[in-house]
């Protein structure tokens, strides 16, 4: 008769206790829509484009969600704030 195998904590190890490897799901890298279109400046009067980067609550979407590069995210933030200031965009959602 063989004795059951034990791990380093002196617990019995069963073959069903072996962990299966977990597949790592890699997210697709988002590309900046403004870099693709070769936009130099983001226009604060283009409300339709700015609305795509605002959440349903009226908050500006972060880079990790919108996929913008740092340069265009800064320009986008300034453009949204300017559009809000002159009442083209709401500060909060309805």
UniProtKB/Swiss-Prot annotation:
<dbReference type="InterPro" id="IPR018275">
    <property type="entry name" value="Ribosomal_bS18_CS"/>
</dbReference>
<dbReference type="Pfam" id="PF01084">
    <property type="entry name" value="Ribosomal_S18"/>
</dbReference>
<comment type="subunit">
    <text>Part of the 30S ribosomal subunit. Forms a tight heterodimer with protein bS6.</text>
</comment>
<comment type="similarity">
    <text>Belongs to the bacterial ribosomal protein bS18 family.</text>
</comment>
<keyword id="KW-0699">rRNA-binding</keyword>
<dbReference type="GO" id="GO:0022627">
    <property type="term" value="C:cytosolic small ribosomal subunit"/>
</dbReference>
<dbReference type="InterPro" id="IPR001648">
    <property type="entry name" value="Ribosomal_bS18"/>
</dbReference>
<protein>
    <recommendedName>
        <fullName>Small ribosomal subunit protein bS18</fullName>
    </recommendedName>
</protein>
<keyword id="KW-0687">Ribonucleoprotein</keyword>
<comment type="function">
    <text>Binds as a heterodimer with protein bS6 to the central domain of the 16S rRNA, where it helps stabilize the platform of the 30S subunit.</text>
</comment>
<dbReference type="GO" id="GO:0003735">
    <property type="term" value="F:structural constituent of ribosome"/>
</dbReference>
<dbReference type="InterPro" id="IPR036870">
    <property type="entry name" value="Ribosomal_bS18_sf"/>
</dbReference>
<dbReference type="GO" id="GO:0070181">
    <property type="term" value="F:small ribosomal subunit rRNA binding"/>
</dbReference>
<keyword id="KW-0689">Ribosomal protein</keyword>
<keyword id="KW-0694">RNA-binding</keyword>
<dbReference type="GO" id="GO:0006412">
    <property type="term" value="P:translation"/>
</dbReference>
């Amino acid at each position: 008769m063989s004795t059951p195998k034990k791990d380093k904590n002196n617990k019995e190890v069963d073959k069903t206790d072996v962990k299966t490897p977990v597949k790592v799901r890699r997210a697709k890298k988002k590309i900046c829509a403004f870099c693709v279109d070769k936009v130099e400046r983001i226009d604060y009067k283009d409300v339709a484009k700015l609305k795509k980067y605002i959440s349903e609550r009226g908050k500006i979407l972060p880079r990790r969600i919108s996929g913008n590069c740092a340069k265009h995210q800064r320009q986008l933030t300034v453009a949204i704030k300017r559009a809000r200031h002159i009442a083209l965009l709401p500060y909060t959602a309805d």
